[in-house]
């Protein structure tokens, strides 16, 4: 009996003196805290939303082209009927059950949030810790902001009043839809800011290792598109600004084309 009592006492002492630090070293997950270790890690994160942007263009092409007088996909015997989805786009008789508008909405907002996550992360990093100059680092951040503006310009064009999300922190985002004017002003401000931070295209041929990346001319071209359609979007004529940025591109202010 004494042996059993001693065993219980000993067990209790072992339990009470057990380790209380339950922090884990996780090897099967990558978080913000342990992802950014090298310059290449930062670069990879920045360009992840670009891959999504490339994919998301598919829905945009369908909505823009098949609903216009440029492209029509006609039924050929029993081919390309697909429940009449292509004909409905051509005749502007689509319904809430058609998937193309939802695909465009989802594609754009997934892209927006991918950009937001990267921008939030970049705001916590010190460029010199990863071998970046300040100009290089700000260029990468500006590319994400420009890409986000491109997604929002598509949303403005297709849906007008949409939610405005600028961070993974929900408190910084709109609680619901914003007006087209608010969205227009956000896009305009972002693109103008990024014009000073993005690189200028070098040379008359391709853009070397920066081919396919956002640069000053790309941001200016988005401003041209924004101002060209301002009367439709927000009821304001902005043709003078449209002409200004278009002429600057033609004059080579943002690189040779």
What annotation goes with each model-predicted range?
Residues 43-47, 51-56, 79-159, 174-182, ...:
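Conserved, well-structured interaction surfaces
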Residues 25, 156-167, 239-240:
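Short, well-structured active-site flanking segments
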Residues 33, 60-79, 168, 199-218, ...:
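Short, surface-exposed recognition loops and adjoining beta-strand edges that mediate ligand/DNA contacts
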Residues 1-28:
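Bacterial Sec-dependent N-terminal signal peptides
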Residues 187-194, 242, 249:
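Tetratricopeptide repeat
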Residues 151-163, 223-234:
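Extended, well-ordered alpha-helical segments in internal regulatory regions
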Residues 145, 220-223:
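TPR/Sel1-like alpha-solenoid repeat signature
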Residues 19-68, 246:
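Membrane-proximal, proline-rich intrinsically disordered regions
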């Amino acid at each position: 009996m004494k042996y059993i009592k001693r065993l219980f006492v000993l067990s209790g002492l072992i339990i009470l003196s057990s380790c209380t630090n339950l922090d884990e070293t996780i090897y099967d997950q990558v978080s913000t805290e342990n992802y950014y270790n090298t310059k290449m890690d930062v670069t990879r994160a920045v360009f992840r939303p670009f891959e999504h942007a490339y994919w998301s263009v598919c829905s945009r092409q369908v909505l823009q082209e098949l609903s216009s007088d440029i492209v029509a996909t006609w039924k050929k015997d029993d081919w390309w009927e697909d429940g009449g989805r292509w004909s409905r786009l051509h005749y502007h008789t689509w319904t809430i059950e058609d998937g193309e508008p939802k695909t465009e909405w989802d594609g754009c907002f997934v892209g927006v949030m991918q950009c937001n996550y990267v921008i939030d992360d970049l705001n916590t990093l010190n460029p010199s810790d990863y071998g970046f100059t300040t100009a290089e680092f700000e260029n990468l951040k500006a590319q994400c902001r420009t890409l986000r503006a491109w997604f929002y310009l598509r949303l403005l064009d297709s849906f007008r009043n949409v939610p405005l999300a600028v961070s993974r922190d929900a408190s910084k985002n709109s609680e619901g839809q914003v007006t087209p004017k608010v969205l227009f002003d956000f896009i305009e401000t972002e693109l103008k800011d990024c014009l000073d931070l993005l690189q200028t295209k070098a040379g008359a041929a391709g853009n070397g290792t920066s081919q396919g990346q956002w640069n000053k001319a790309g941001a200016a071209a988005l401003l041209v598109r924004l101002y060209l359609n301002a009367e439709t979007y927000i009821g304001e004529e902005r043709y003078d600004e449209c002409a200004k940025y278009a002429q600057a591109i033609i004059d080579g202010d943002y690189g040779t084309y």
